[in-house]
Amino acid sequence: KGSILGDKTRMEQLSVHPNSFIRPSPSAGSLGGVARKTRETIILCEAAGFDKIFVETVGVGQSETAVHSMVDFFLLIQLAGTGDELQGIKRGIMEMADGIVINKADGNNIEKAKLAASHFRNALHLFPAPDSGWSPKVLTYSGFYGLGIKEIWDMVDEYFAFVKANGYFEQRRNEQAKYWMYESINEHLRDSF
């Protein structure tokens, strides 16, 4: 099971690249927006030598936050021009974001994307500073024209340099390992009784 056709349709170039591996995992029946064994899959990919691992959730909502306990960088991707950019976002998800990207910033949507980015930047100032000490950035992106991808990579690289220098990266990895162990024990107990 999985959305292999949908994934490959959206990732024409990436899906055929010799250095990439795409593993669709159905999340049906599990909360958190990710499949039950996503954490284990991440560890396997790291062991296989993949240095950049992307985990896509099923959507945005309060239940799609489990992925935050599994990843080193939480990127929130939003569409502009839907009319309720900020109203539709749960506070908890915005507080988790290490970066926010406004997608489809092209054609008639460019100004809407810039406005949405401005709204998100303003909203981020209302939240307490993240434990990492990092100030999340808000960028725009056009997949159609390929505009903004360099800026997104630069943001991610800047984030990793920042959190590795201040020790937060290692602290976060330790927290992830503890959370994974806790969840594994809970899952085993639920399945046993």
Regions found by a protein language model. Give the residues of each.
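Long, well-ordered amphipathic alpha-helical subdomains in the mid-to-C-terminal portions
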Residues: T140, E151-F193
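Canonical P-loop GTPase G-domain recognition
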Residues: R91, M96-V101, A105-N166
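Nucleotide-state-sensitive switch-loop elements of NTP-binding domains
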Residues: K1-S63, M70-L76, D84-E85
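Conserved phosphate-donor/acceptor-positioning beta-strand/loop module used by diverse small-molecule
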Residues: L75-L79, V101
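Generic recognition of short, well-ordered alpha-helical segments
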Residues: G33-R36, A66-S69, G88, E111-L115, ...
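Conserved nucleotide-binding/hydrolysis micro-motifs of P-loop NTPases
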Residues: S27-G29, G59-G61, A80-D84, A105-I110, ...
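Short beta-strand/turn micro-motifs at beta-sheet edges
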Residues: T9-R10, T65, L86-R91, L126-P130
